[in-house]
Amino acid sequence: MNGVLLAIGVLLPICLASGALLGYAAVRLRVQGDPVAERVNALLPQTQCGQCGYPGCKPYAEAIAAGDRINKCPPGGEATIQALADLLDLEPEPLDAAEETPPRVAYIREAECIGCTKCIQACPVDAIVGAARLMHTVIADECTGCDLCLEPCPVDCIEMREIAPDVRHWKWPPPSPRLIASDRERAA
């Protein structure tokens, strides 16, 4: 019993001193981040796909905070551009792509898959499941359509397919501005 009390008596001051030193170092050596970049990063989809020309969402957020354009994120689409424009008090710009493509997901032809796991390693959102030397499959609800899994596949068994409109992926066409204006005129 005396040995236990002796060990506690020796270790307790060491732990308290180490904790105080770590707490002081955390406050004194704190790295200040850009609050605008952090808020922009929170709005980006976090797919880390690189389609914007930056290696991930955080570097793109830092570039936006430094003055880069807000319309380079295809996975985020128009909704992200609008949210960024509202945050930064800018005019929303059209998406910087040839055309806005319909949402797509990866599809693995399982009969051709050799189970190399290269696509699993490339997927930034862990939407591909499988084990070594066994076929893999894609969780469509998790897939962001970033295309990063296509290139590493040695047997080209992955393809991108458009998401067919169904109950979960339906888009109503927006009403025409003239219709909205005429409704307001009648209400007034």
UniProtKB/Swiss-Prot annotation:
List of residues binding [4Fe-4S] cluster 1: C49, C52, C57, C73
Swiss-Prot/TrEMBL keywords: 4Fe-4S, Cell inner membrane, Cell membrane, Electron transport, Iron, Iron-sulfur, Membrane, Metal-binding, Repeat, Translocase, Transport
SUPFAM superfamilies per UniProt: 4Fe-4S ferredoxins
Domain 4Fe-4S ferredoxin-type: from-to ranges: 104-133, 134-163
Binding site for [4Fe-4S] cluster 2: C113, C116, C119, C153
Subcellular localization, as worded in the UniProt entry: Cell inner membrane
Reported cofactor(s): [4Fe-4S] cluster
Record EC number: 7.-.-.-
Cofactor remark: Binds 3 [4Fe-4S] clusters.
Bridged cysteine pairs (disulfide): none
Keyword Translocase in annotation: yes
Domain 4Fe-4S: 32-90
GO cellular component, as recorded: plasma membrane
Main subcellular location: membrane
Binding-site residues, [4Fe-4S] cluster 3: C123, C143, C146, C149
GO BP annotations, alphabetical order: electron transport chain
UniProt-annotated stretches for the region Hydrophobic: 1-26
InterPro entries in alphabetical order: 4Fe-4S_dom, 4Fe4S_Fe-S-bd, 4Fe4S_Fe_S_CS, Elect_transpt_cplx_RnfB/RsxB, RnfB/RsxB_Proteobac, RnfB_subfamily
Superkingdom: Bacteria
Database matches in PROSITE patterns: 4FE4S (PS51656), 4FE4S_FER_1 (PS00198), 4FE4S_FER_2 (PS51379)
Subunit structure: The complex is composed of six subunits: RnfA, RnfB, RnfC, RnfD, RnfE and RnfG.
NCBIfam families assigned: PRK05113.1, rnfB
Similarity section: Belongs to the 4Fe4S bacterial-type ferredoxin family. RnfB subfamily.
PANTHER family on file: ION-TRANSLOCATING OXIDOREDUCTASE COMPLEX SUBUNIT B (PTHR42859:SF3), OXIDOREDUCTASE (PTHR42859)
HAMAP family per UniProt: RsxB_RnfB
Protein name stated in the entry: Ion-translocating oxidoreductase complex subunit B
